[in-house]
Amino acid sequence: MTRTPVPGTRRRILQTAARLFKEHGARAVGMQQVVEETGLGKSALYREFTSKDELVRAWVAELHDHAWAQIDSAIARHEGDPARQLLAVVEHAQESTQDSDAHGCTFYNTSAEFRDPGHPGRREAVDHLERLRERLSALATAARATDPDALADMLMLIISGLYANAATLGPSGPAARSVAAARILIDQHVPAHVPTPEGRRA
């Protein structure tokens, strides 16, 4: 007889897994630990997620959606000024490291933990980072940067360095200079402009 899933079970599992993955790293946490922490039986867990790989993938996918909602919101605050929107992405990244419990960037961390290119969680993490790079390049193109792809790549390096430094040396260390570094970089690659309501240069 097939048991009917209890409403909220999937959410409960994901919330518990997210906490454990953040505290111990996704690779170090086993399915049995998730079972014990949720208080659910193994059958309930495996009914929602057929394997740990699938659980990690779902966790990263959920973080991906949450991160993009925040990035889109940061960008939307500077509509019509793509150069300022580029800086807003870095500002958002810096703000996200202010939490004293921050452990770096989940997407970079997951990619480092699961080295197999075919791992579902790693694929989700890499997809997020590739989309971020593409978004930065598109904004740089809209801002008429001299070399949009180069500017996007250098901003990606600032963002990754920001997360790494904030996690090790704290948000008040070198990470605190990330926005200033990004501003200098953007100013060097984007000609001076006056944004118009349509987002075009005057």
Predicted features along the sequence, with ranges:
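Amphipathic alpha-helical segments used for helix-helix packing
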Residues: 85, 99-120
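Amphipathic, non-transmembrane alpha-helical scaffold segments
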Residues: 60, 64, 122-130
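A short His-aromatic
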Residues: 46-49, 53, 113
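Alpha-helical DNA-contacting segments of helix-turn-helix folds
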Residues: 56-63, 70
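Hydrophobic alpha-helical connector segments
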Residues: 58, 72-103, 142, 152-155
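Key DNA-contact positions within bacterial/archaeal DNA-binding proteins
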Residues: 43
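Hydrophobic/aromatic-rich alpha-helical bundle segments in the mid-to-C-terminal region
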Residues: 118-127, 141-202
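Basic, helix-initiating cap at the start of DNA-binding domains
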Residues: 1-24, 28-40, 54-57
